[in-house]
Amino acid sequence: MAQLRWGRKGVRSQRRKYSRPVAYKPPSSKVVSHVETVLNKKDVTGAEMKPFNDGSRYSMKKIMVSATLTMAPGELLNYLIVKSNSPIANWSSSFSNPSLMVKESVQDTVTILRRGKLESSGTAGKDVTKSFSRFVNLGLGISQTQHLYLIIYSSDAMKITLETRMYIDV
């Protein structure tokens, strides 16, 4: 339960004479992770976004995902940001191949938070660098028992640099 501070201050203005109660917020921190990898052609892959590996207590309230890709012209990248109550072991058995729809076997445990796609354009023979950045509010938050994943389908082999900034309440 949030604590309220009811301190009465002097007259501030004609419309709002006294201060309103201020809800107490727990201290938050930012955790940054950086991953570089190569995606395979026509393959569903994923990465778990987790601030700590040691199992310390935390609650993740929001996350910023930034990715930079080097891809050939005319290629496609679909991505999902999902929340799951249980770990996902096999990406291709949980999500359909080009469209990244959640398969029936894991529908009860997976919640889609955000989705998007990147398409490259340019002249043939030259690689194109594309990037995306997504800021996701997680509502009540994700505790250390839940899992947050970035699921990616790429139409061709491409190099990705993934950076996440997680805002957590410790």
From Swiss-Prot:
* Annotated stretches, region: Disordered: 1-25
Give the source's domain of life in one word. Answer: Viruses
User: Per the record, what is one GO cellular component?
Assistant: T=1 icosahedral viral capsid
Q: Which InterPro entries does the UniProt entry name for this protein? A: Nanovirus_coat (IPR006753)
Where found, per UniProt?
A: Virion
Q: What is its main location?
A: virion
Q: Where is the composition biased (Basic residues)?
A: 1-19
UniProt keywords (A-Z) are: Capsid protein, T=1 icosahedral capsid protein, Virion
What family is this? Answer: Belongs to the nanoviridae capsid protein family.
Spell out the protein name for this chain.
Capsid protein
* Originating organism: Subterranean clover stunt virus (strain J) (SCSV)
